[in-house]
């Protein structure tokens, strides 16, 4: 028996090593890996106050693994026992988005359409703003390892979207910054606003330099009738095994003369939410990370109850939970995030909207979607 276990152990170890070596080799050749900031850019990043020894830092001490180490996380991801209901049994309900309907709006209307995971279209001040537009079914350069989208289709394709005024990227992980989507959007998007260092990926993928602007925390840009502000998050970055934290990560604030919207990006709970609320709130709506949590990475992703508290911290009137209903990236039931978030929001009397994929949420136009569809 022990001999058999040793043989199995060697086979498993060999398989893991093969996956790692093959993955690194392939990723280093794949354009999806993106680009690298120049030496001059890295020197400039040191002035940001949160870049040290070649890596971006969080505002408070943060570790990637609160239990185990990187190897145990990888082992759990590849071979860990799945939980019940980790993936939906059938495609999720979805409303197809008519591209013509996006053009029908006024400068005063705020409409948000969530596509699943974090990808969302925010129509505000007459502008089309895309948040982390990961609009592909497969993720990353090695799709047989990484999770695929639950639904085989999205509410709309990148090709059918109208002209985009700005794309906002929160960080460079594959489930938020997608090579194929950027390639399809690069010629119809006026501006790409990204955290420090992320511009190198876009340049490598053929986005015109004039369309790319990197923003540090606290930086802002002005479009007619709209202010966009980069604000802190508590996370990490990297698209390979050797470039962790070489680029920054952000949350985002959108301000029109009459409405304000907040997008958390990815990240753990922290005091930055209260600071953002004090500086930029109150918000009419907050799109907040809610999903892909685990006790092994408790400082870089929020529990649903923390999502609700963070929404209160930023002083948002309504919560729209995102970062779920598309990919399985953690060992919890696929609908556990929304069940727990709605329960906690009810307990704390926080309004929450729960649209289906592709269902528009229009502020000030009557009751917001609250159907229990999961």
State where each predicted segment sits.
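Active-site metal-binding motif and surrounding structural segment of the metallo-beta-lactamase
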Residues: 48, 145-193, 281-287
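Active-site metal-binding loops of divalent metal-dependent hydrolases
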Residues: 133-135, 172, 233-234, 265-267, ...
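Acidic/histidine-rich helix-loop elements
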Residues: 135-153, 236-244, 294-300
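Cap/insert and terminal regions of metallo-dependent hydrolase folds
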Residues: 2-10, 26-54, 58, 158, ...
